[in-house]
UniProtKB/Swiss-Prot annotation:
The name this protein goes by in its record: Carbamoyl phosphate synthase small chain
Organism, as annotated: Sulfurisphaera tokodaii (strain DSM 16993 / JCM 10545 / NBRC 100140 / 7) (Sulfolobus tokodaii)
Binding site for L-glutamine: S53, G234, G236, L263, Q266, N304, G306, Y307
Lineage: Archaea, Thermoproteota, Thermoprotei, Sulfolobales, Sulfolobaceae
Subunit description: Composed of two chains; the small (or glutamine) chain promotes the hydrolysis of glutamine to ammonia, which is used by the large (or ammonia) chain to synthesize carbamoyl phosphate. Tetramer of heterodimers (alpha,beta)4.
Active site: C262 (nucleophile), H347, E349
Gene transcribed to yield this protein: carA
Length: 372
């Protein structure tokens, strides 16, 4: 059967196990390589595609229709985006079952137009369920996405593995960025690719936020006299970030409150003597349950991580379990028993996702206020 492609060109996805999937191209024509991962989120593709944690990855969205509500115009509060997670699309490529035209009053462009304008290839009209089943059974693998081109020698694009690249070099700012607050309390965000949703939640609590590069010197961080420090999310293998890990250790000597989120949770774990390992296919969804051990309450949370603390034995010394995932037992947060450090593997800010656990930021604010 002849494949009809509404954008006029075909596309392909090559997986490192030799699987070749043919579909229709959309967005920009081009060839890109990346780690193939999937999200089960049913909405929030503008936020997902701009999440720096997806840098270096080809994202497969399991929901069958993607693009229905288009792409909105960027909106900001004190320089912080309120409807995107960064200034640009971060994924290497996008794979969907069906790319649809938008029908919503505030759409400024279609998904196709957005990817086209930012040079990102897309692939549609493929069986995303079969891709997800393969990734779920075999584990994440490298792949090559081609839109408007055939992949003649895919292996040449796969010479370097995702786990071997420090992607924070592409997602961390080159110089400090300040977002003014109204409480007089200044916090520093160590920005390895932080989501604007995290910045927004911090700004809503009145903080003046100083975003510093991922590998910013600790003495320069302390020049801002921060009342607290946040290590936010970001892409890639945390075990490669030895400079960031050492900076975290050095910061603990000042005994100021620290909040680690996602990659920040992993950096904190490694810095304090715990272990972080690669997961088979990770958690990428907006409906993952976590249990708060202190209250025995279950919350529905947003996740985007391919590494984690896989068991209680991997927790750092002098830490106590805070959150655990009831599905697979992975550690979703811990609290240090001697230092003012709290961490979550999940995203308390959501974006996209439920706001069940935004109170984590309130807990951090109380820690900062006590320190002030």
């Amino acid at each position: 059967m002849t494949l009809y492609c509404k954008r006029g060109y075909k596309g392909y996805l090559y997986l490192e196990d030799g699987t070749l999937i043919e579909g229709c191209g959309f967005g920009a024509k081009g060839i890109r390589a990346g780690e193939v991962v999937f999200t089960t989120s049913m909405n929030g593709y503008p936020e997902s595609l701009t999440d720096p944690s997806y840098r270096g990855q080809i994202l497969v969205i399991t929901h069958p229709l993607v693009g229905n509500y288009g792409v909105p115009e960027k909106q900001r509060v004190e320089g912080i985006l309120t409807n995107f997670e960064s200034e640009q699309i971060q994924v290497e490529g996008l794979v969907v079952s069906e790319e649809t035209d938008p029908f919503k009053w505030n759409s400024s462009k279609s998904l196709h137009e957005w990817l086209l304008s930012e040079g990102v290839p897309g692939l549609s009209d493929v069986d995303t369920r079969s891709i997800v089943k393969k990734v779920r059974s075999r584990g994440v693998m490298m792949g090559v996405i081609a839109s408007g081109y055939e992949i003649e020698d895919p292996k040449k694009f796969l010479e370097k593995k995702y786990d071997e690249i420090d992607f924070t070099q592409f997602t961390s700012p080159k110089a400090p960025i300040v977002h003014l607050g109204n409480t007089g309390e200044t916090i520093v965000v160590v920005d390895c690719g932080v989501k604007h949703g995290i910045l927004y939640q911090l700004h809503q609590r009145g903080f003046t936020i100083v975003r510093v590069p991922c590998k910013f010197n600790v003495s320069k961080i302390m020049d801002y006299y921060p009342k607290g420090v946040v290590f936010g999310n970001g892409p890639g293998n945390p075990n490669l970030l030895q400079e960031v890990i050492e900076n975290f250790k050095e910061l603990t000597e000042y005994k100021i409150p620290i909040l680690g989120i996602c990659l920040g949770h992993q950096v904190a774990t490694l810095a304090m003597g715990g272990k972080v390992n690669k997961m088979k296919f990770g958690h990428r969804a907006i409906n993952k349950p976590v249990i708060d051990i202190s209250s025995n309450k279950c919350y529905i949370t947003t996740h985007n991580h391919g590494y984690g603390i896989l068991s209680k034995e991997d927790l750092p010394p002098n830490s106590k379990l805070w959150f655990i995932n009831p599905d697979d037992g992975t550690i979703e947060g811990w609290i240090h028993e001697k230092l003012p450090i709290i961490t979550t593997q999940f995203h308390p800010e959501a974006r996209p996702g439920p706001w069940d656990v935004t109170w984590v930021f309130d807990k951090f604010k109380k820690m900062v206020s006590r320190n002030a």
